[in-house]
A protein has these predicted regions:
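Cyclophilin-like peptidyl-prolyl cis-trans isomerases
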Residues: 21-213
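Long alpha-helical, hydrophobic tracts
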Residues: 3, 18-21
């Protein structure tokens, strides 16, 4: 729950910032696209369809290896997308969906080192996949996919903090499925504090996650 709250609070700070700060890009050195051999495609089959994500093991090797560990041992199979965060039009629109392992902590592996966006050059933009975390070195299995650019989730981003959230890949197929999950019914009462009104009801099942060619 701590990692959920941290994302919610950072997003609240980000969306409360002046519009100029929200839309201004985070200064960074341009990064060349990752070579094909550094990208690992993974399919996430859900009850609403398939999402295919290219994981960037060249620029985010630790985070990618961790995600693949869960994929290869089938620990995401049978789990859920459980959250859909919607930003208002005044906040720039868009949002994110979040999923992972929430029902069986025995399936969790140890937390991993944080790979900041300032280190990898992979930013929290529309279509990116990032790890949920309560702080550096706490990410385990939960992840989110963005439907809009959110520079406030980058390291040192506007309205965010110095660490941000580790982005490690991007959707290459199935953004329509991401949007369908995002548009699914939300409970008006489930969730605590800043998370209230963001919990999917019912949750969207992750049938399986696997590497694909």
């Amino acid at each position: 729950m701590r990692m959920l709250t941290r994302i919610a609070l950072l997003l609240a700070a980000f969306t409360a910032a002046p519009l100029l700060a929200q839309t201004a890009p985070v200064p960074s050195t341009p990064v060349a696209p990752a070579p094909k051999e550094d990208l690992v495609p993974v399919a996430i089959d859900t009850s609403l369809g398939r999402i295919v994500i290219a994981l960037d093991r060249g620029r985010a090797p630790i985070t990618t290896a961790n995600f693949l560990h869960y994929v290869d041992t089938h620990r995401y199979d049978g789990q859920n997308f459980y959250r859909a965060m919607h930003m208002t039009s005044a906040e720039g629109g868009g949002g994110l969906i979040q999923g992972g392992i929430t029902t069986d902590v025995r399936k969790l592996y140890p937390p991993i080192a944080h790979e900041a966006t300032s280190q990898t050059g992979i930013h929290n933009v529309a279509g990116a996949i990032s790890m949920a975390a309560a702080g550096p070195g706490t990410a385990r299995a939960d992840f989110f996919i963005l439907l809009s650019d959110m520079p406030g989730l980058d390291a040192g981003g506007p309205g965010g903090d110095a660490n941000g959230f580790a982005a490690f890949g991007h959707v290459i197929e199935g953004m329509d499925v991401v949007k369908a999950i995002w548009n699914s019914p939300i409970s008006a009462t489930k969730g605590e504090d800043a998370m209230k009104g963001q919990m999917l009801d019912p949750v969207i099942k992750i049938i399986k996650a696997e590497r694909v060619k």
